[in-house]
Regions:
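Auxiliary tRNA-acceptor-end handling modules of aminoacyl-tRNA synthetases
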Residues: 1-236
Length: 236
């Protein structure tokens, strides 16, 4: 299978070729701890843990730049035909979290330099950085260790170094960018059963008018790969 992106690393940076067919598709961006020099860090994280939930993102571009969008997944308005919807939309535009200069463009793809994006902490994604930083960052220690590209995901191992208050702190973070299916999974309302984590959402209703709070359970979409569907249906 063809990789999701094509990566080229050299002395000038880490260049990512992104197919235009993936523009405006939904992605999840996440980061977890691979190694730490000590678990006695500011947020008390161990290897294998993450601090933040994965973040929903989209990509878009114009003639000069590629943009990373952070849609709001917790405030919804489903009735787009209502007369009041334009007023809601004016107060719910999608913010831009990152932008990059387009280094090269073809009919089917664009190329950007993601060196800084991949090798530095991303606010609200990386477990160490900003308010959760173990100490003063040591940029000379921040570097990309490994990049793996698959059909539907990008996996990057990154090293971060910090001065620390009493001793130096070194960590390796695994950043993941996952391409989501074009057809979203059917959500399920949370109930009182034990064992489910849930995500709160607010739904705007113009007819009432009101704002309804709803909780949806978090669950995994576990389905067979296309090549294994027949075996799955046969119970193998």
């Amino acid at each position: 299978s063809a990789p999701m992106f094509h990566i080229r690393q050299n002395t000038k940076g880490c260049f990512v070729e992104i197919p235009k067919r993936l523009i405006n598709r939904d992605f999840l961006l996440a980061a977890r701890v691979m190694t730490v020099s000590s678990p006695n860090n500011k947020v008390k994280l161990y290897a294998g843990q993450r601090l933040y939930d994965p973040v929903w993102i989209r990509l878009k571009y114009d003639k000069e730049q590629l943009y990373l969008l952070r849609p709001d997944s917790k405030n919804l308005c489903e009735d787009t035909t209502h007369l009041s919807y334009p007023a809601y939309a004016r107060n719910a535009i999608t913010p831009i979290a990152e932008s990059w200069k387009i280094e090269q463009e073809t009919d089917s793809s664009i190329v950007v330099n993601w060196s800084k994006f991949l090798s530095e902490p991303i606010e609200g994604v990386d477990p160490f950085g900003g308010k959760t930083s173990p100490g003063r960052s040591l940029p000379q220690l921040n570097k990309i260790l490994q990049v793996d590209v698959h059909e539907k995901n990008l996996e990057v191992s990154v090293q971060y170094g910090f001065e620390g208050t009493t001793q130096p702190f070194l960590t390796t973070i695994r950043k993941s960018l996952l391409l989501l299916p074009e057809q979203p999974m059917q959500p399920r309302i949370h109930d009182a059963r034990v064992g489910y984590d849930n995500i709160p959402k607010r739904k705007f209703n113009f007819d009432t008018p009101s704002i309804a709070a709803e909780n949806y359970i978090t669950r995994f979409r576990i389905v067979p790969s296309p090549k294994d569907v027949r075996s799955y249906l046969q119970g193998k």
